[in-house]
Amino acid sequence: MGNLLGGVSFREPTTVEDCDSTWQTDSEPEPEQPGPAGGGEGQEQDEREQPEQPPERAGGRPRASPVPEDHAEAAGAEQGGDSTEGNAKPKRSFYAARDLYKYRHQYPNFKDIRYQNDLSNLRFYKNKIPFKPDGVYIEEVLNKWKGDYEKLEHNHTYIQWLFPLREQGLNFYAKELTTYEIEEFKKTKEAIRRFLLAYKMMLEFFGIKLIDKTGNVARAVNWQERFQHLNESQHNYLRITRILKSLGELGYESFKSPLVKFILHEALVENTIPNIKQSALEYFVYTIRDRRERRKLLRFAQKHYTPSENFIWGPPKKEQPERSKAQKTPTLPALGSNGQTSTHKKSKDSKNSSAASHLNNKTVEEKKVASREPGEETDKPSPEASSEDTKPRNSEDDNAADQSESPPKKTVNDSAGKGECPTTSSEKDGEGENQSKDSENPENTSCHAEVVSQQNVTNPQTSSG
């Protein structure tokens, strides 16, 4: 009974987050080829993030849980609580998360508890033995029970035989599947044919019909009556969970997503079976081993779930800001700072060059004024300066001149004539901005040169030394 593998201990998950790896990564792995019976073996197996935990060798009964998965009083209370919740925000069930975690991980650390020749489930599906305790063969169930909704509703011992699992259910006469039995079952066409007929029978009981060999489903003819019954008989949600698990065990993993998508659509979009939405999101979705398929279904559900703020099965909120930060911080701040640095460097270089230019011009001008006799050129405007003033200048030079003349003017010598070039207060104060503007104006340089040449002409004493 549930013998542990020698020397290996399985660490039980302790939180819902430990059990659920659906949103651990957004990378979508490449799809793989489906298994031989259209399902589970070829698809991406769920949650390989814990390689140190070996998969179960075969499907023995899981370690004793507080309550068996199929127990109506325990699991039914969780799966059937939708109608009483109203608008209250739902909560994730640790019991459900742990149970489905073990299922998706092939029941780790447990060995087969039966001999390989004890193929009770396969022999039942080969019509060799009846299911216990009722003593009914599979052919009678498929032929006489089909459409008898009262019998299918009130009998609680057949479902474990029709959809066997590697875990104990409510009917203790039913035998758990083993790994060897699963492989033999898939090889037996007779068993597979009857298994699909049993699946169709139960779908019709729920008001659903299988429409093709890929697992797509649609509403049955009597869907309105059966949906109303399904919405009110919440113990059938346990049966749907078991059916989904069994599909995955016996090679029809690919049949799960179409059925779950259909149920989510009817519950959230059409509102025909609203009471099932909690079980669909908490149980049905998480029977699917492929993370990609789970993400697709949960995104669809989130789009239609109301109120949207009560949807608790999406990606964790703490991961979203981290991704947005990583996307927003490539190189923009670095470029901005580099741009500012280069601008400052350019302005500093221009200020330094303009300051040096003005110092040289100022030194020449002071020497010139010092050598000049007081009042000598008071009434003699420079012809060169006059001719220079008469030349047309472009608008840029005018703007530069206006800006340089905007502060109050101060001449070096109060007796200087109109022909002398004005020296602004910015030249005396040495402010960088106006100095850089003056250094860029070619008129100031030419004006100083003209004054020097004029001084040499009008003051022969100075020129002669």
UniProtKB/Swiss-Prot annotation:
Residues 1-89, 309-465 are annotated as: Disordered. Residues 48-59, 316-325, 363-396, 426-440 have a biased composition (Basic and acidic residues). Residues 442-465 have a biased composition (Polar residues). Coiled coil: none annotated. GO terms for molecular function: opioid growth factor receptor activity. The keyword Nucleotide-binding does not apply. One of its GO terms (cellular component) is membrane. Keywords: Receptor. Belongs to the opioid growth factor receptor family. PANTHER family: OPIOID GROWTH FACTOR RECEPTOR OGFR ZETA-TYPE OPIOID RECEPTOR, OPIOID GROWTH FACTOR RECEPTOR-LIKE PROTEIN 1. This is Opioid growth factor receptor-like protein 1. It comes from Rattus norvegicus (Rat). The gene is Ogfrl1.
